[in-house]
Amino acid sequence: MKLTCMMIVAVLFLTAWTFVTADDSRNGLDYLFPKARHEMNPKASRDIKRCRPGGMICGFPKPGPYCCSGWCFVVCL
């Protein structure tokens, strides 16, 4: 009984600690990158292509923003 109560208190404490020490109560990854965007060099960012067009080699099969279509299977689809 004592062990159960101690475990419940520990879980509640750790949960509260996580919420108190969090930087942002919203999903932090969604808001992390837009905050840092103003620190980027605008001239350097113009030279970087955002995505690869269809037919370009992309490396390995994965969905994501690497290809403009969002799909890669050796070449961008």
Curated annotation (Swiss-Prot):
Disulfide bonds join 51-68, 58-72, 67-76. Keywords: Cleavage on pair of basic residues, Disulfide bond, Knottin, Neurotoxin, Secreted, Signal, Toxin. It is found in: Secreted. This is Conotoxin VnMKLT1-012. The presence of a 'disulfide through disulfide knot' structurally defines this protein as a knottin. The cysteine framework is VI/VII (C-C-CC-C-C). The keyword 4Fe-4S does not apply. Belongs to the conotoxin O1 superfamily. InterPro entries: Conotoxin. GO terms for cellular component: extracellular region. Residues 1-22 form the signal peptide. Its main location: secreted. It holds the Pfam family Conotoxin. It comes from Conus ventricosus. Expressed by the venom duct. Residues 23-48 form a propeptide. One of its GO terms (molecular function) is toxin activity.
